[in-house]
Amino acid sequence: MRAPLWLRDLAGAWIFYSVLPAWPGLKPRFERIARFAPWIGLVLGGLQSFLWLVLIRADWPTSAVALLVIGLGAWLSGGLHLDGLMDTADGLAAGRERCLQAMDDSCVGASGVQALLVVVLLQIAALLRLGSLAPLALLIAAFWGRCAPLWAMARFFYLREGQAGSASFHRRYRQGWQEALPAFLVLLLALTVVPLLMIVGWPSQMVLMAGIGVGVLPAFLVPELLGRRLGGHSGDSYGASVVLVETITLLLLAVLLTAG
């Protein structure tokens, strides 16, 4: 029996966006994998959350746990998005005329290193502030981070159209609003679960409620601002959008949920 195309796309997203082993017996397809990136984000965020809970239960210091969790996230994604962040930072620093040339350069510039350092420090600070709320916040941030490129793909031209090895296939095969359907299903499930959690008095219900709304604005604004600045998007800026939205979402959750 032939597997449905959506399942093959999901299998393709699984191995494209992570270093997790491929699914046995299922031939992956890559044309429309971007729509499933938010689902992969939930898986990776879930693994980070699991590591956090295990190490905290083992009485590891929170600062060490935060570092290891961030390191795990970088490894699970194969450094794909962090590489895009550094290349995009170098491109922005080079100016519009030399932007793509700087982003294509295999050498990392000072701006790329600074961007990576700042992002990691901000994520550590947010996780330390969140404390016991960090596991759920990691899930929320990973989801919204992977939603950001969907807006970039829908809204902006691809800067390296036709270039070998580019991520232009994301735009080439996208089918309008259907690309956002998997992400909408997650949000619908969350909106359905929240009232049930309120009934049973689950202590982290406020985190979930805040997370549904907190990530929306950065998931649209970050790719929008990057696209306007760069004159379009590329695979690098897709990755940068993921990392920046993750970081901003963690910070917003840290501020909102620990205020007072």
From Swiss-Prot:
Cite the NCBIfam families for this sequence.
cobS
Q: Which residues cross the membrane?
A: 3-23, 36-56, 60-80, 108-128, 133-153, 180-200, 206-226, 239-259
Give compartment(s): Cell inner membrane
Cystines in this chain:
none
Instruction: Give the family, as the similarity comment puts it.
Output: Belongs to the CobS family.
Species of origin: Prochlorococcus marinus (strain MIT 9303)
Q: Could you tell me what this protein is called?
A: Adenosylcobinamide-GDP ribazoletransferase
| GO molecular function per UniProt | adenosylcobinamide-GDP ribazoletransferase activity; cobalamin 5'-phosphate synthase activity
What this protein needs as a cofactor is:
Mg(2+)
Please indicate if the UniProt record lists Transferase as a keyword.
yes
Known role: Joins adenosylcobinamide-GDP and alpha-ribazole to generate adenosylcobalamin (Ado-cobalamin). Also synthesizes adenosylcobalamin 5'-phosphate from adenosylcobinamide-GDP and alpha-ribazole 5'-phosphate.
Q: What is its main location?
A: membrane
Gene that this polypeptide is encoded by:
cobS
Please provide, in alphabetical order, the Gene Ontology terms of the cellular component aspect for this entry: plasma membrane
> What top-level class of enzyme does the UniProt entry assign?
transferase
Q: Copy the pathway line from the protein's UniProt record.
A: Cofactor biosynthesis; adenosylcobalamin biosynthesis; adenosylcobalamin from cob(II)yrinate a,c-diamide: step 7/7
Which reaction is recorded as catalysed by this protein? alpha-ribazole + adenosylcob(III)inamide-GDP = adenosylcob(III)alamin + GMP + H(+); alpha-ribazole 5'-phosphate + adenosylcob(III)inamide-GDP = adenosylcob(III)alamin 5'-phosphate + GMP + H(+)
